[in-house]
């Protein structure tokens, strides 16, 4: 899929991987890049505009933990402004297993709520045009970092939720896939808390292993968006992009 003249809404598009991905996106000659994030970063927005002045870059403050009704209200404003949204990227995330409720709220519940809100506009059963959802998971959604089970569990939930969305595409007209970064050099992993402090040096130990840069991750992130494969579970690790096969151990039969 060509991203030329597409309208993309990026939740948390100013974070570590998020900002580098936004930089790559504007190079693709989008029509609009709408960034939703908790904290405004005027310098980053200005930089994105300067990279490609042909792309309209706008920012709206957004906390993914707000009720669905609040998200729907914000999306209504965005649709009124740019008329159509082609791709929604759900990228909000925190890594701190001391914050159990917030980890689940940001990493999973917020993603579900944002998705639910945009379906109000996209669902073909309501006369919507359909759309594409790219959800950011993590390789910990496949195999947990067991010292951070809350974070890992939230990412496993993202993978399962998104796989379900993909199977619902014939009904809703909305396709979906996950991008799942491996350990990436960002502020997220430089210092974080393990669950019940089971490993005080978890961040330090993790970074002893091979990592990738956020730029490497961002380049493959955008490649995955361009490949636009419904139901794909993309692994973005050590500078590579790979579609993995989820092992089926049970089938509901429906």
UniProtKB/Swiss-Prot annotation:
GO terms for cellular component: cytosol. It is an enzyme of class 1 (oxidoreductase). Gene3D superfamilies: NAD(P)-binding Rossmann-like Domain. It comes from the Eukaryota. It holds the Pfam family adh_short. It catalyses: a primary alcohol + NAD(+) = an aldehyde + NADH + H(+); a secondary alcohol + NAD(+) = a ketone + NADH + H(+). Substrate binds at residue 138. Its EC number is 1.1.1.1. Signal peptide: none annotated. The active site is at 151 (proton acceptor). NAD(+) binds at residues 10-33. One of its GO terms (biological process) is alcohol metabolic process. InterPro entries: ADH_Drosophila-type, NAD(P)-bd_dom_sf, Sc_DH/Rdtase_CS, SDR_fam. The keyword Acetylation does not apply. Keywords: NAD, Oxidoreductase. One of its GO terms (molecular function) is alcohol dehydrogenase (NAD+) activity. Belongs to the short-chain dehydrogenases/reductases (SDR) family. PANTHER family: ALCOHOL DEHYDROGENASE. Homodimer. This is Alcohol dehydrogenase. The lineage of its organism: Eukaryota, Metazoa, Ecdysozoa, Arthropoda, Hexapoda.
């Amino acid at each position: 899929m060509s991203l030329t003249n597409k309208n993309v809404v990026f939740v948390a598009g100013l974070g570590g991987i998020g900002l580098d991905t936004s930089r790559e996106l504007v190079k693709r000659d989008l029509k609009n890049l709408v960034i939703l994030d908790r904290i405004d970063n005027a310098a980053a927005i200005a930089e994105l505009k300067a990279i490609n002045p042909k792309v309209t870059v706008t920012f709206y403050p957004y906390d993914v933990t707000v009720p669905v009704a609040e998200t729907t209200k914000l999306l209504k404003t965005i649709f009124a402004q740019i008329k159509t949204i082609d791709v929604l990227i759900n990228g909000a995330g925190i890594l701190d297993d001391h914050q159990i409720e917030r980890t689940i709220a940001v990493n999973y519940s917020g993603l579900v709520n944002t998705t639910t809100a945009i379906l109000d506009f996209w669902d073909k059963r309501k006369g919507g045009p359909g759309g594409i959802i790219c959800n950011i998971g993590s390789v910990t959604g496949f195999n947990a970092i067991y010292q951070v089970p809350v974070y890992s569990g939230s990412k496993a939930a993202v993978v399962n939720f998104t796989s379900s969305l993909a199977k619902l595409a014939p009904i809703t007209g909305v396709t979906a896939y996950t991008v799942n970064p491996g350990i990436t050099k960002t502020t997220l992993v430089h210092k974080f808390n393990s669950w019940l402090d089971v490993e005080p040096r978890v961040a330090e130990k993790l970074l002893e292993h091979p990592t990738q840069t956020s730029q490497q991750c961002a380049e493959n992130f955008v490649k995955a968006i361009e490949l636009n494969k419904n139901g794909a579970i993309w692994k973005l690790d050590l500078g590579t992009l790979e579609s993995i096969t989820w092992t089926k151990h049970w089938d509901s039969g429906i």
